[in-house]
Regions:
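Long, highly charged, low-complexity intrinsically disordered interaction regions
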Residues: 2, 10-78
Length: 78
């Protein structure tokens, strides 16, 4: 699991951004991709979801946003 990924934003799509970190482009799902700018450097705090046939990264601009997300997904029934 990654705590965060830092690098340059290379792509922005409706539900994710692509961030370059040492030559590897990570696709990270974010709540508001248009809050990022291509060519700028960011640190994105990440949550790694591992399922049977899926490995996904979810990202947040702040640690507080990530902590809120972790609290929400810990609620039973969601």
């Amino acid at each position: 699991m990654y705590g965060y990924i830092s690098g340059e934003i290379k792509g922005i799509e409706p539900s994710y951004v692509i961030i370059d970190n040492n030559g590897i482009g990570y696709l990270i799902y974010v709540p508001n991709p248009y809050g990022f700018m291509i060519g700028k450097n960011y640190t994105i705090y990440t949550y790694t979801k591992v399922a049977e046939d899926e490995y996904s990264l979810y990202g947040f601009k702040t640690k507080e946003e990530k902590e809120l997300f972790l609290k929400l997904i810990s609620v039973k029934g969601l």
